């Protein structure tokens, strides 16, 4: 971070499952417009974007991150099978699948091994599974930190770091604006994944249903945080895609999400979005399905 925190900028990446691809489109246009953060903060799936961008914070790095998202399939993140379900039941284990696939994905693609080796100061948020308290990881093995931050309770196993069992950062603080403020940052650009506000029918699988519900909670909490911290920092929130029909469990449309988010973000920047500190209406409770059906 720069020596003068009052003039520094943080990018804050929220969680949102597969909708994390939207943040990559936002990031592409922010970087193209000349935005250069002094640090990055991320939680849950946003920790993946934060960690990758911190390692290569330029247009080429964003392009490589976009290519990664376009290659990801759900089985690369959550390799569910009847075998994994039976194993959970028979072995009485507290998670559905092992995180080997996610860990391998991170090890193959992150260009550094320790958080302190990143080109930008990186702060990853996880949750103490016993106390529910937020844990900010600013040093140590980056793969462990990201894996912990993305460890959805009940789906993935917790990750032990420093003797503390950690799970998804979204449980404690999914859009960690407060972390950036505690670091002394006074200008924050928030990249929210948003939520599927135009689903015509509820998600069919249990996991898809749960992740969609979480994105609704995330958006509501983000609005509250923006209202709470708005007087303590200059906070710019990139509007998420709206209307959006893609579930946070659907990894088949990442390329389209990236391109559409980039287009919308460019229009927002051109309209002076980075000069305003407002809460986008797209984050507030709403639904479009009824309107789209006509």
Give the location of each predicted region:
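Catalytic domains of lipid- and phosphate-ester/thioester hydrolases
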Residues: 1-38, 49-55, 63-66, 185-188, ...
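Patatin-like phospholipase
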Residues: 4-102, 106, 138-148, 192, ...
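Intrinsic-disorder/low-complexity, polar/charged segments
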Residues: 18, 114, 202-209, 250, ...
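Short alpha-helical interface patches
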Residues: 48, 115-118, 213
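Active-site-adjacent alpha/beta core region of enzyme catalytic domains
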Residues: 78-196, 228-279
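Short acidic, glycine/proline-enriched helix-loop-strand junctions
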Residues: 197-222, 231-236
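Amphipathic repeat-derived elements
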Residues: 13-21, 27, 40, 150-169, ...
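Short, basic, helix/turn surface patches
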Residues: 65-76, 213-226
């Amino acid at each position: 971070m720069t020596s003068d925190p009052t003039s520094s900028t943080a990018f804050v990446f929220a969680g949102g499952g597969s909708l994390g691809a939207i943040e990559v489109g936002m990031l592409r246009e922010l970087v193209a417009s000349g935005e250069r953060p002094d640090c990055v903060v991320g939680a849950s799936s946003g920790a993946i974007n934060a960690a990758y961008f911190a390692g290569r914070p330029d247009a080429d790095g964003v392009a490589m991150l976009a290519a990664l998202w376009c290659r990801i399939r759900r089985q690369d993140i959550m390799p569910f099978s009847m075998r994994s379900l039976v194993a959970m039941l028979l072995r009485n284990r507290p998670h559905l699948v092992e995180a080997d696939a996610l860990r391998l994905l991170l090890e193959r693609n992150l260009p550094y091994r320790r958080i302190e080796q990143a080109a930008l100061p990186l702060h990853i948020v996880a949750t103490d599974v016993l106390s529910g308290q937020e844990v900010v990881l600013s040093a140590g093995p980056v793969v462990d930190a990201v894996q912990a931050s993305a460890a959805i309770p009940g789906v993935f196993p917790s990750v032990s770091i420093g003797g503390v069992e950690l799970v998804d950062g979204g449980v404690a603080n999914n859009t960690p604006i407060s972390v950036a403020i505690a670091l002394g940052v006074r200008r924050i650009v928030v990249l929210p994944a948003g939520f599927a506000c135009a689903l015509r029918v509820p998600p069919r699988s249990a996991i898809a249903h749960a992740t969609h519900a979480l994105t609704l909670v995330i958006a509501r909490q983000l609005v509250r945080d923006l209202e709470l911290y708005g007087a303590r920092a200059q906070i710019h929130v990139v509007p998420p895609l709206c209307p959006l029909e893609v579930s946070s469990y659907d990894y088949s449309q990442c390329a389209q999400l990236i391109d559409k988010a980039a287009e919308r973000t460019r229009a927002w920047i051109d309209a002076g979005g980075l000069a305003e500190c407002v809460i986008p209406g797209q984050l507030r409770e709403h639904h479009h399905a009824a309107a789209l059906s006509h």
